[in-house]
Amino acid sequence: MLKTLLSLTTTFLMFSTTISAQNKYFLTYYNKAEKLYQAKDFINAKLYYDSALKKNPMHAYSYFKRALSVYAEGNLPSALLDFNKTISLDPTNADAYNFRGDTKIRLKDTLGGIRDFDTSINIEPNNYSYYTDRGEAYYDLDSNRLALKDYTYAYKLDSTKYRAPFFMGLIYYYSEKFDIANALFKKCTKIDSTAPGPYFYRAKIMYNIDNYDIALDEINNAIRLFSENASYYVTRAKIYMFNESEYDDDMAIEDLNKAIKMGSEEARELLEEYFSEGHP
């Protein structure tokens, strides 16, 4: 009996030593992976998460971080597998559901993605990003009522962030509720004055209500912030064309030519129409 007990004790000590060594190596690999991940070296981070998981194949967070690493590199099928494994080991990880939802949407499974967004919101019902992510999915499906509901709730959670009021502005803009859209885009410019989108849409609103001076100011702001969008130049050309000055016509032609070089078919059609009307 004593011999058997001593044998069991020896076996337990050997097992404990093995587990301790595995934990030591796991932590070494995991900590190295985390440093690489923070440095945005996702390729090598993934390799160290691989090594960590060989030492501890039940560590849910390592699967999650490996999923994020391959997600960042654009390997969506592999990311999906690791998000699945994360959730199977830790079904309370709201971020895993949220990222899996985004991954599914990128893989053209929009409804599956929305179901994952639903779950992430059920786990963390006051997370701003979860609502804006689901709102964007609904927006892409043209489910504007549901999108607006999510963006409005997100905006109530945090009115200092840009994403919710911007998409709310888009929904109201395309519903031709220009007063509401304009107010939201103006709010966006105060939240982030470096984002060109709100200036662009404010320019389009002012153009639609024949306020060309303000429209020109706003589109100039958009182009100053981002000069590689053909639609910005087309919009400014349209504004110039409604002025009486021939100098403005010259600038409109210059803008249309810039947009054409960027591949804008609308600019090409506008320029052909302009000259077909007898302009020199």
Sequence positions of predicted segments:
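Structural signature of tandem alpha-helical TPR/SEL1-like repeats
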Residues: 39-47, 72-85, 107-119, 141-153, ...
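Helix-start (N-cap) detector for alpha-helical repeat units in TPR-like alpha-solenoids
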Residues: 25-27, 60-61, 94-95, 128-129, ...
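Terminal, low-structured helical/coil segments at or just beyond the last alpha-helical repeat
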Residues: 25, 241-242, 246-280
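Bacterial Sec-dependent N-terminal signal peptides
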Residues: 1-26
